[in-house]
């Protein structure tokens, strides 16, 4: 179980809120968050309530200016704890939504689905084992999305409209 402390102002100033589990709407506890400390574990922060929209991955460390770190002053409204470790990792990725197009299966990190599988993009996936981060661009760059075991039939339904993913990485003991 992880632990994160949010602060209303930069440099760990102002009111604080301590969190050790998922929170679907952090605005219930504080009006804004401009810095945080991850004392243990890993967390994914989401731009909108109920784990929707743009995401940002946080591991153990201090984040003294969240707005500067996240693109264009993005604020976040919900947070999810990334539970680990998993010994097995397995995911099926599909080129199109709802099981469409080419399907490939992976059990390890993939820095480019174009190079490895000759797939133009990934728009649907089924995570059988482990927790993963999917990235918008090859070589683990760009916007990201956190996935835990389950079926993800349409990234659009998760508030990621127009997103396509080109690389994916397992969440192991990197937290």
UniProtKB/Swiss-Prot annotation:
Keyword Repeat: yes
PROSITE patterns cross-referenced by the UniProt entry: CRYSTALLIN_BETA_GAMMA
InterPro entries the UniProt entry points to: Beta/Gamma-Crystallin, Beta/gamma_crystallin, G_crystallin-like
Regions annotated as coiled coil: none
GO MF assignments: structural constituent of eye lens
Record's keyword terms, sorted: Eye lens protein, Repeat
Domain (Beta/gamma crystallin 'Greek key') ranges: 2-40, 41-86, 89-121, 130-172
PANTHER family, per the entry: BETA/GAMMA CRYSTALLIN, CRYSTALLIN, GAMMA M1-RELATED
Biological role: Crystallins are the dominant structural components of the vertebrate eye lens.
Subunit organization: Monomer.
Protein family: Belongs to the beta/gamma-crystallin family.
Name by which UniProt lists this protein: Gamma-crystallin M1
Organism: Chiloscyllium indicum (Slender bamboo shark)
Gene: GM1
């Amino acid at each position: 179980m992880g632990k994160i402390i949010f602060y209303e102002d930069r440099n760990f100033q102002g009111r604080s809120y301590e969190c050790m589990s998922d929170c679907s709407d952090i605005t219930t506890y504080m009006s804004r968050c401009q810095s945080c400390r991850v004392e243990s574990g890993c967390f994914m922060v989401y731009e909108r309530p109920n784990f929707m929209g743009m995401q940002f991955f946080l591991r153990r460390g201090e984040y003294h200016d969240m707005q500067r770190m996240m693109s264009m002053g993005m604020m976040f409204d919900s947070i999810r704890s990334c539970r680990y470790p998993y010994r097995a990792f397995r995911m099926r990725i599909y080129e199109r939504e709802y099981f469409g197009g080419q399907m490939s299966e992976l059990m390890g990190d993939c820095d480019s689905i174009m190079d490895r599988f000759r797939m133009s993009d990934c728009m649907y996936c089924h995570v059988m084992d482990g927790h993963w981060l999917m990235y918008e661009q090859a070589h683990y760059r760009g916007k990201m999305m956190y996935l835990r075991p389950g079926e993800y039939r349409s990234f659009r339904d998760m508030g990621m409209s127009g997103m396509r993913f080109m690389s994916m990485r397992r969440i192991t003991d990197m937290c």
